[in-house]
Amino acid sequence: MFGFRLFILAAVALAYIQCAAARMTVAHRLGARSLPTPENDPFYTPDDGWESAAPGTILKKREITVANSGVFQYGVRGFQLLYRTSGVNRGDASHTVTTVIIPENYDKDKLVSANMYEDSYSSNCAPSYSMRKGSKVFNDLANSYQMLFITTLLHEGWAVTVPDHEGPNNAFTSGRVEGHAILDGIRATLNYKKLGLNSDAKVIGYGYSGGALATGWAASLHSQYAHELNVAGWSMGGTVSNVTEWLGYIDNTTGAGFALASLGGLSSSYSELAWVQDNLTSKGRRLLDQSAQNCMYQNLWAVGKQKILDDSVFAGGSTFLQNDGALNILNKLTLGRFSKFVPIAPVFMFHATHDEVVPFNMAITTADAWCAQGAQIKFLSNTGSEMEHTNTELFNLPNVIFFMRDRFKGKDFGGQCQYPSSNDPWFNPQILGTSAAIYLQQVLDLIGNRIGGHDSILWDKVHSKQQP
């Protein structure tokens, strides 16, 4: 079984590389020009007076060509919306961009918010940049991989909105900022009349790892901040639900780059943590400046196994997690800590018990807290020794799709608090078969295959006597 999995993954990777080589050669011969990065693109700057607009208001819009890795043009329509959102607090005016992807024959009653794990302190890694044709080739490998899953959502006939949930300050791990950005991105997408989406369309949000952190906060803030949205469910895996615990866990490991990006994001979002950047050493300034130019994998490679919470990086670094002022902020970023911030739509969580990047106990503690507070939670534990952070996302993609289909169809969720376990999702023949079909389709999409529900959406509506 494990050898067969490796064979499938190797075949997909080989096809991806071959497609990439062909597309990159063509792009080079045509002299393709790179797009301006967000900090040099005036689209990302709102016009004067934007602060008075309501959250979710569209400030600018444009049509774009959607591509993976800057060169693989997808057979879809793409739009970008600059919209008003909120910062840490409801009254803090902010703005960000969402990329809306429309497949062929899409269902106007359904919308998915795909909340990518950007996990960086660089605006160059914003999905809205990396998802455009002409962006720097293979600018963000994490983004390139996640776009493969997005095409799977599009083939279901669902419109997808992809928010830059870190916002203009690259607020990685600033959960409330990211949650607001996701909810307002959904609002903006539904407000864009050109798409024709119904104002009460069912919405599902999904995120993994750092994207799960953002999704968890969107789920938590939904009832208080954007209760009018018709959210059918939330799905998240490898969830960073306790930033305080996570920073201590990943520091001085191969994931130390996450700690550095988190410090940058938190200190740029919270005035109470601005002292971190004010007290950087020369080494710390060099590391953070470098991080501001690097996407996730580049940052991990550059900073791996270094101690970031250390006085050699910033004064007070070694006692940062004991600092009362820092803890006052960090503890507010723990999912499940506050009873007023509880998901009101069903939540599907999944996590590997041997996750080496995000501790399992952190996520299940949040699930337990939400259940105790009345939320509907299904928490799937993957117990196989081979299940780790990266492959847990990959192997659970069919489970995420099944959850979304059921939620959109209005099926019974099956109970308030559910705690199933699975050794390895691929031991399930249905999961294995679905996975193989998904990976094959993703390769076809890279070479320009039309993406969407094709005629299936129309026929479903005709058979159910709905207006096509």
Swiss-Prot record:
The record's GO molecular-function terms, alphabetically, read: triacylglycerol lipase activity
Protein name (database record): Secreted triacylglycerol lipase LIP2
SUPFAM superfamilies in the record: alpha/beta-Hydrolases
The protein's gene is named: LIP2
GO cellular component entries: extracellular region
Q: Name one Pfam family in it.
A: LIP
Its subcellular locations are: Secreted
Bridged cysteine pairs (disulfide): 125-295
> What protein family does this chain belong to?
Belongs to the AB hydrolase superfamily. Lipase family. Class Lip subfamily.
Inducing factors: Constitutively expressed regardless of pH conditions or exposure time.
Q: What Enzyme Commission number(s) appear in the record?
A: 3.1.1.-, 3.1.1.3
Instruction: Indicate yes or no for the key word Manganese.
Output: no
According to its UniProt entry, the function of this protein is described as: Secreted lipase that hydrolyzes acylglycerol lipids such as triacylglycerols and consequently releases free fatty acid. Due to an absence of fatty acid synthase genes in Malassezia species, secretory lipases are essential for the yeast to generate free fatty acids from degradation of sebum and assimilate them as lipid sources for growth. Plays important roles not only in lipid metabolism but also in the immune response of host cells and pathogenesis.
Q: Which residues form the signal peptide?
A: 1-22
Q: Which Gene3D superfamilies match?
A: 1.10.260.130, alpha/beta hydrolase
For this protein, the record's InterPro entries field holds:
AB_hydrolase_fold (IPR029058), Lipase_secreted (IPR005152)
| Keyword terms, alphabetized | Disulfide bond, Glycoprotein, Hydrolase, Lipid degradation, Lipid metabolism, Secreted, Signal, Virulence
Instruction: Name a single GO biological process.
Output: lipid catabolic process
- The question of whether Chloroplast is a record keyword is answered with no
